[in-house]
């Protein structure tokens, strides 16, 4: 997910995206805790995507 794609979305769409990413992060953490997660780099990718979405939401709210 690129930041340029996210800037074109509305705040409502970004909030929906954020909710989906948080759910995905939860599922990945549960898989990691039970030893089922083989691609541990996915945790890092999702965490950074959450940060991207939150940053753009904050910038749009301030504008």
From Swiss-Prot:
Is this entry keyworded Ribonucleoprotein? yes
Q: What is the lineage of its organism?
A: Bacteria, Pseudomonadati, Pseudomonadota, Gammaproteobacteria, Alteromonadales
**Similarity remark:** Belongs to the universal ribosomal protein uL29 family.
GO BP annotation list: translation
Q: Which Gene3D superfamilies match?
A: 6.10.140.1970
Q: Which GO terms describe its molecular function?
A: structural constituent of ribosome
Write down the InterPro entries for this protein, in alphabetical order: Ribosomal_protein_uL29, Ribosomal_uL29, Ribosomal_uL29_CS, Ribosomal_uL29_sf
Which HAMAP family does the protein's record reference?
A: Ribosomal_uL29
Q: Name one Pfam family in it.
A: Ribosomal_L29
| Gene Ontology CC terms, in alphabetical order | cytosolic large ribosomal subunit
The protein's matches in PANTHER family, at most eight in alphabetical order, are given as: 60S RIBOSOMAL PROTEIN L35/50S RIBOSOMAL PROTEIN L29 (PTHR10916), LARGE RIBOSOMAL SUBUNIT PROTEIN UL29C (PTHR10916:SF0)
Which residues are in coiled coils?
A: none
Tell me which domain of life the UniProt entry assigns to the organism this sequence originates from: Bacteria
List the protein's name.
Answer: Large ribosomal subunit protein uL29
Q: Which SUPFAM superfamilies match?
A: Ribosomal protein L29 (L29p)
Q: Which UniProt keywords apply?
A: Ribonucleoprotein, Ribosomal protein
């Amino acid at each position: 997910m690129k930041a340029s794609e996210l800037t074109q979305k509305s705040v409502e769409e970004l909030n929906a995206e954020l909710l989906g990413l948080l759910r995905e992060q939860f599922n990945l953490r549960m898989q990691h805790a039970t030893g089922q997660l083989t691609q541990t780099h996915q945790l890092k990718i999702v965490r950074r995507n959450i940060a991207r979405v939150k940053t753009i939401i904050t910038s749009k709210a301030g504008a």
